[in-house]
Amino acid sequence: MATPAKKTGSKKSKRNVPNGVVHIQSTFNNTIVSITDTNGEVISWSSAGASGFKGARKGTPFAAQTAAEAAARRALDQGMRQIEVLVRGPGSGRETAIRALQVAGLEITLIRDVTPLPHNGCRRAKRRRV
């Protein structure tokens, strides 16, 4: 029987990135955490869905915490120590994700809310009737 061929794909090299920017996009349905270097190159990312949560549980604060921990762990492996945090969106996982980054061992130097606010742009969605 033939032996399976070894995969020789290009493996991403581990860079030493001491400081970066964490983008937290928190919606009502999911939380996405992307960690970039200062130029905007993505170093690690995670989301509530990628962390194993499905459906309505993706929008919970605990799911946001788990996603932030996973992204922070991968960033720490690449040598990241100091971060700036940019938070976008109205979701429930905003504060929990920031707290999880701090507990993971990253030093937060700045927290900024960059939620886009319309100057009376598009019409809002109709109100839900349950």
Curated annotation (Swiss-Prot):
Q: Which UniProt keywords apply?
A: Ribonucleoprotein, Ribosomal protein, RNA-binding, rRNA-binding
Is this entry keyworded DNA damage? no
PROSITE patterns assigned: RIBOSOMAL_S11 (PS00054)
- GO biological process entries: translation
Q: Which GO terms describe its molecular function?
A: rRNA binding; structural constituent of ribosome
Q: Which GO terms describe its cellular component?
A: ribonucleoprotein complex; ribosome
The answer to whether keyword Transferase applies is: no
Taxonomic superkingdom: Bacteria
The transmembrane segments are: none
Q: What does this protein do?
A: Located on the platform of the 30S subunit, it bridges several disparate RNA helices of the 16S rRNA. Forms part of the Shine-Dalgarno cleft in the 70S ribosome.
Q: How does it assemble?
A: Part of the 30S ribosomal subunit. Interacts with proteins S7 and S18. Binds to IF-3.
Q: Which family does it belong to?
A: Belongs to the universal ribosomal protein uS11 family.
Looking up NCBIfam families in the UniProt record yields: PRK05309.1 (NF003698), uS11_bact (TIGR03632)
What's the name of the protein? Answer: Small ribosomal subunit protein uS11
Per the UniProt entry, what species is this protein from, by scientific name?
Answer: Prochlorococcus marinus (strain SARG / CCMP1375 / SS120)
